[in-house]
């Protein structure tokens, strides 16, 4: 089994990639996270687009550890906010990773926006960097922003994001399997599967 570093400390992201690999029948890779390797200096997320941030994180992880590395950068693009929060999604309220504060600010900004103008998309860019080269893919998940949070699954803006393909439920009301099948990150990770299969075969 060859190690594949997921350049994140978010265990939910690690579990999501593991489910995608299992569903695709990809074997021969052992997933490890940043918590499983020696600490290294991580570059700040300064890219203007998701792809830049994902690639920078994967490059840093590969350079520091020598392990094939996968990284993602994802966020929410809201039409009424001209595509924001975008790459600032995780720190929209000024506090990085404060899901409740970020969501509360988003809902406040959209308070007077009518339902027909609350369109939004989750976007995920995933990058794989290994000795064989670099691959970058992108997945999108269209929907709209609800008026109040619903559901207790997922993370981030999931409780206020109503996907177009979820029969009125928020992303936080979907099971992990349902979310994997249609989510932005699930779509991006599935696009990465052929490269991961090649990586597994090369090391098998």
UniProtKB/Swiss-Prot annotation:
Keyword presence, Transit peptide: no
Keywords, ordered alphabetically: Hydrolase, Magnesium, Metal-binding, Nucleotide metabolism, Nucleotide-binding
Cofactor(s) this protein requires: Mg(2+)
Highest taxon, organism lineage: Bacteria
InterPro entries linked: dITP/XTP_pyrophosphatase, ITPase-like_fam, RdgB/HAM1
Catalytic EC class: hydrolase
Active-site residues annotated for this sequence: 73 (proton acceptor)
Cofactor mode of binding and number, as noted: Binds 1 Mg(2+) ion per subunit.
UniProt binding sites for substrate: 8-13, 74, 155-158, 179, 184-185
Catalytic reaction annotation: XTP + H2O = XMP + diphosphate + H(+); dITP + H2O = dIMP + diphosphate + H(+); ITP + H2O = IMP + diphosphate + H(+)
Binding site for Mg(2+): 73
GO molecular function annotations of the record: dITP diphosphatase activity; ITP diphosphatase activity; metal ion binding; nucleotide binding; ribonucleoside triphosphate phosphatase activity; XTP diphosphatase activity
UniProt-listed NCBIfam families: RdgB/HAM1 family non-canonical purine NTP pyrophosphatase
Family according to the record: Belongs to the HAM1 NTPase family.
Oligomeric form and interacting partners: Homodimer.
Protein name in UniProt: dITP/XTP pyrophosphatase
Classification lineage: Bacteria, Bacillati, Actinomycetota, Actinomycetes, Mycobacteriales
């Amino acid at each position: 089994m060859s190690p594949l570093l997921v350049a994140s400390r978010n265990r939910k992201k690690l579990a999501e990639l593991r489910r995608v690999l299992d569903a695709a029948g990809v074997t021969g890779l052992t997933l490890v996270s940043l918590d499983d390797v020696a600490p290294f200096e991580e570059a700040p997320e300064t890219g203007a687009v998701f792809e830049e941030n994902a690639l920078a994180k994967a490059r840093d992880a590969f350079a520091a550890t020598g392990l094939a590395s996968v990284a993602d950068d994802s966020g929410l693009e809201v039409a009424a906010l001209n595509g924001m929060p975008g790459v600032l999604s995780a720190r929209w309220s000024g506090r990085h990773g404060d899901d409740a504060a970020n969501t509360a600010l988003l809902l406040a900004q959209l308070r007077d926006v009518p339902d027909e103008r609350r369109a939004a998309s989750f976007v995920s860019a995933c990058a794989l960097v290994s000795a064989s080269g670099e691959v970058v893919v992108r997945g999108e998940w269209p929907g709209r922003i609800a008026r109040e949070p619903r559901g207790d699954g997922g993370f981030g803006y999931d409780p206020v994001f109503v996907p177009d393909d979820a029969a009125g439920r928020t992303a936080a009301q979907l099971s992990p399997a349902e979310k994997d099948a249609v989510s932005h990150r699930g779509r991006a990770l599935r696009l990465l599967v052929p490269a991961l299969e090649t990586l597994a075969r090369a090391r098998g």
